[in-house]
Structures are given as structure tokens and as C-alpha cells.
Amino acid sequence: MRLVQLSRHSIAFPSPEGALREPNGLLALGGDLSPARLLMAYQHGIFPWFSPGDPILWWSPDPRAVLWPEKFHLSRSMKRFHNASPYRVTLNYAFDRVIDGCANHRDEGTWITRGIEEAYRRLHELGHAHSIEVWRDRELVGGIYGVSQGALFCGESMFSRQENASKTALLVFCAEFIRHGGKLIDCQVLNNHTASLGAIEILRRDYLDHLAALRQQPLASRFWVPRTLFLPRK
């Protein structure tokens, strides 16, 4: 196994099965963040992740973290919070502000560089990248953005400025996603936060099988049209 240098003249990627074991999933470097290359990457289970000043690095880790939306873990405390929630959740209302929020909410720095922001804004303009926003009155207090692949949604990042805001975004999105034919959410690499919400790890080859099938399955018509999302409270 060796790290592959991508060409600027071809958007092809090597097989994810050739990714390094350490660091886990590192597959290639270089290339660019053009819409065509990004879409090619997501179609093959690959995503960019690199620090400011580093070359573009492309990853496909094994195992892969995923969330089956019907398995979202709603804790008792979160259920009580949601039943009296002061938040309003929207879809694709403020993509630029969500990705900016994800880039700026970490004190220790971010991997979301200006180039990443510009690249995903272009994907959003083309209808491939989407955002879920959480509002308290008129203030944006949390959100998620990611890339759609048919009935699979590749979550990229989330942020929260007030209590349970990003959890609310994911909870409401999961319910709406299921209702419109969504099957799986890619969480890339498992962490304590996503694990607490129900994410699990599966083998990369199993993720790639799911991706190949689900990206061919369209969601219900006009699912990504900007609108307010609702979840019945119980």
C-alpha cells in the first residue's frame, strides 16, 4: 500500500481498498477541490480532510462510522428538551452561514479552510451539498452540512452555539429523511458525540456496498427544497 499522488488532469481515484492502515484510511493527496472531483470522491466513499497549509488529503477509513436514521438515540433528557424546545429547524435556508459556523466554532482551529468552504458552496449551488439549520428566534444557533448521494447523506460537520442545537438538527433531519426515502447517514469517523447519538462502525467494504446501492435510489421529489422541518412532539 502506498499513498497516491493525484493528477490535476484526471479526477479518477485509486480504489479505497488501497488506503493506508496508518493513518487509517489515508488514500491519496493532491488534485483539487473542483465539483467534479468532489462528486467523484463521494461516489466512491472518499472524502477530503486536511489541515491549513497541508496538501489536499483524501480518506476512506476502515471501519466507517454510519448512522441508520431510524436508530437515532433519543435520550430521556433529549426527549424532554425536544418536547419543550425553543428551536425551529429549516433545510437549505442558510448554507453559507452553516458552513461558516462549522468552520469557526472550534477554539483549537478547524480543518474547514477557505478553500473547503468555497468548494462546498459550489456543490451547494449545484444542488449536491445541503444544510440543516437550527434557529432560536432569528438567531442561527446550530446546524449540519453534508453531501447527498441518493438515499445516503454524507454528513460533513456540525456546530452548536446553544444547548442541544446540533442534536436537534440531526434528530429532526433523521425523521424527515426517513419519511422521504432516506436510508443511511455517513458519519465518516466515529467520535463520542456521534456514538452517543446512535452512530456505529461498519466495515469499509460494507459501507461501499451500501453506497453503491443507495446512491442510485432517489429521495422523494423536491426533498431538498428549502423549507421548515417539523417533528411531532410526544
UniProtKB/Swiss-Prot annotation:
Chief place of localization: cytoplasm
The keyword Cytoplasm appears for this protein: yes
One annotated Gene Ontology cellular component of this protein: cytoplasm
UniProt GO molecular function: leucyl-tRNA--protein transferase activity
Gene Ontology terms describing biological process: protein catabolic process
Pfam family, one: Leu_Phe_trans
Keywords of this entry: Acyltransferase, Cytoplasm, Transferase
Catalysis performed (reactions): N-terminal L-lysyl-[protein] + L-leucyl-tRNA(Leu) = N-terminal L-leucyl-L-lysyl-[protein] + tRNA(Leu) + H(+); N-terminal L-arginyl-[protein] + L-leucyl-tRNA(Leu) = N-terminal L-leucyl-L-arginyl-[protein] + tRNA(Leu) + H(+); L-phenylalanyl-tRNA(Phe) + an N-terminal L-alpha-aminoacyl-[protein] = an N-terminal L-phenylalanyl-L-alpha-aminoacyl-[protein] + tRNA(Phe)
Compartment annotation: Cytoplasm
E.C. no: 2.3.2.6
Enzyme class: transferase
Xref: NCBIfam families: aat
Similarity comment text for this entry: Belongs to the L/F-transferase family.
Its biological purpose: Functions in the N-end rule pathway of protein degradation where it conjugates Leu, Phe and, less efficiently, Met from aminoacyl-tRNAs to the N-termini of proteins containing an N-terminal arginine or lysine.
Protein name: Leucyl/phenylalanyl-tRNA--protein transferase
Organism of derivation: Salmonella dublin (strain CT_02021853)
High-level lineage: Bacteria, Pseudomonadati, Pseudomonadota, Gammaproteobacteria, Enterobacterales
